[in-house]
UniProtKB/Swiss-Prot annotation:
The COPII coat is composed of at least 5 proteins: the SEC23/24 complex, the SEC13/31 complex, and the protein SAR1. Golgi apparatus membrane; Peripheral membrane protein; Cytoplasmic side. GO terms for molecular function: SNARE binding; zinc ion binding. This is Protein transport protein SEC24. It comes from Meyerozyma guilliermondii (strain ATCC 6260 / CBS 566 / DSM 6381 / JCM 1539 / NBRC 10279 / NRRL Y-324) (Yeast). Belongs to the SEC23/SEC24 family. SEC24 subfamily.
Amino acid sequence: MSKRRAYPQPQYAISQDQAPATPPVGASAAYGVPQVAQQFQQMNINPQPGAQPGAAVPQGYGYNQYGQQPQPGQAYDPYQQPPQANTGFGGQQQTPSQQPYQQQGGYFGAGAGGQAAPALPLNQLYTTDLSRELPPPISDLSLPPPPLVIPSNTAIVPTSEDSNASPDYFRSTLNVIPNNGTLLKRSKLPLALVVRPYTTLRVDQENIPAASDTIISRCRRCRCYINPFVTLTEQGRRWRCNLCNLQNDIPAAFEYDETRGVPRNKFDRVELNHSVVEFVAPKEYMARAPQPIVFVFVIDVSADAVNSGLTSTVTRTILESLDRIPNQNKTARVAFLGVDSNLHYFRFDEGLEGSELLIASDLDEPFLPSPSGLLINLEENRPAIEKLLIDFPTYFENTANTQFALGPALKAGHKMIANIGGKLITFAASLPNIGEGKLSVRDEASHSGQPKESQMLLGAADKFYKSFAVECNSAQVTVDLFLTSARYQDVATLSNLPRFTAGQTHFYPAWSCVKPEDVTKLSKEISEHLSMDIALEAVLRVRSSTGMRSSAFYGNFFNRSSDLCSFPSFPRDQSYVIEMSIEETITKPVVYFQAASLHSTSYGERRIRVMNLAIPTSSKLDDIYASADQLAIANYFTHKAVEKALASSLPDARNYIVKSIVDILNVYKKELVAGNVSGSSPLQISTNLRMLPLLLFSLTKHLGLRGERVPSDHRAAALNRLSSLPIPHLIKYIYPTVYSLHNMGDECGLPEQTVTVNEETGEEETTSGGILLPEPINDTKASWENYGLYLIDNSSEVFLWVSGDVVPDLVYDLFGTDNLYSIPTGKTELPELQPDESEFNYRVRNILGKIREQKDQITWKNLYVVIGGSSNEPIEISQQRDLMALRMWALSCLVEDKTANEQGYREFLTSLKGKVAQ
């Protein structure tokens, strides 16, 4: 048991008979019930699978993760796969036909078409009652999806641990696929794929095997890439496509290395062993030679931008980030364009250490004032570029120009790079108010919070931006936006630019260089953005087994055809959802999906990243529910809700979410509850879906969808994030993570210590890992203590809540003062006390650093310190409007709680009960 820091709390001592109904802060999600061993205690069900044997589980997909216990005599961790040494399904001894690399009635390594495997028991269905799961066990949010249970001979190399894709890259909302469309519709569960081709910002941070010999074998009919699930036929000379069943020839180079003159073992090839792999593409995969990295910096130089410090901060950050721009082969090119009521170009002469300012005032027909010297090689012109970035703010320091011609500037930038493609990275502190694409302030007072809010405030106010974005996409040009205005900026309209060009909208409301924290956030995010290893001229296509097809696509890209998604540049911090439909009855026990991204790397190499997924099928509704992935389903419903919010109305989006939950509960009650007892609870659901109602309820209260009045720029920015975030960040954005700090274990905030035994010496060795975080607690005030200290992470910001009745010693340990009301509040940073002065301060700063540490997002999370209310609070404190607003903002993260205008999770379940019972 971990130690707890003991702060004096005599004024809060509670006798046994006065113990509160709410559990102590820091308790597990089950509030006193051991998280794994007794997780099913409140469900009134047997956590053991009973007579049904457990199936062998692909490594990496979790095992028995919803509380099933190991059998007597087994000592494996319940969240891990049990030992599989020479065992078959359910722990049985393997027969010769199950042993890897055997020839039992089929060719060596025959794959999916080898000896038929017996029918597998799929994941067991466990039922839980949502009304008895309060507070909800949020530890489920960190669990992997239900296991993918497929026959051992599905993969061509049965011993490969990576034959099925990790859910980090490729996952399905259903880990058992209905065998016909009627069953899918009856289930009311969505069938969609979540694709995330890249999981880190930089290539060197991930380890994806690559086939570098440019030998690529594809199906002649469906163009599927050879993969771990194909079948070898004719003694290994041909392979049968696992998607369309066509036979294809095995390339001779799979068996013989012509360059070295030595034989090869085809079973060693990475594409037959790994589900996520890259191919180095030959010339036939190139419409033209790979293009260099190209950045055109479009910088607002109007009075708003200059006075707020945006112009100087941006140019200084670019200067400091030049070495971070991916430029391995020294071909990266850059251009700079200042924008107010004129277009300010900067022309460079080769070999000179300066640049020439060229001003164009014709906004109707933007033209390039020089045929050369505007777009230049970064490496060859480094001194001149550095000098320009140092001098750039001085060109505009005394400006009184309040106009901002964004539309003409974008068209000019497009002209510069239309023949090679690239990125238009745009920094704006003003509303575009002159030239093509001119926008005006909308009437928020009349429409915010009203039924027509979507049409009047969230739709595009000018068709120029979408049409221009589509034009950019066809020219391989991406637009990224960094918006910092203190006033209305029409994010809803401008965000069409990144949405259809595979870019992103970054929003910094009321940004000012006077606030060091604002400067830090913008600078860090620009720098991370510039250093990201983007993929250029990319397309993404998802293929599936015969009888299925893709029917809808969600994310930031342009859908070029029925199944081809176009990305001028492929960002590494977003994910995408593809909805699937079942067109024919599926007769095979396993279906397959393959996602392939063709792209050019930032170092000039054409590559194809291929991801493969094999999923079992079933005709039983209970199999489908038992293997549904609640996080992927929540991701799908988020995209659908955003789509409805923009196309129809916010109330329609919220109603859609609630109706979806009701439909799922109705199906479960009518078809899967044992005996369908009339008096049974209407809130029963499979255990693996018990967090889905909480997530979707939280989504209805999110800034992007809630019914209250919300500034339209903030709402539009939130909708953009909801429709592009990868699942781990999306879940935190919907349901924030809350940590209790005042009673965390002594090991929290310090490097995790792992003790291992050296096999040679027999001595214990201790290694240090990452910073250990406290266990999250539920998003409700009921899990808080009025003298506590809490950290709230909502994926965008971090709030440090200091309760109004906090113990003075705790304040002193963290802030170096025992005067609660003297500590800085709002956007700030913690004081850096030395470990010998305050270990607690050191540990909390470590925790904050760990939360901010992200290898897959550019987001820098600002810290907001909030002092909670108290009956002893000085009157001058309670009258501070900024502090009151800050409290409301932080408390809005406690989504399980009831507010003045919105119901809490308990009330929501009560309302669901009435809807389902009808």
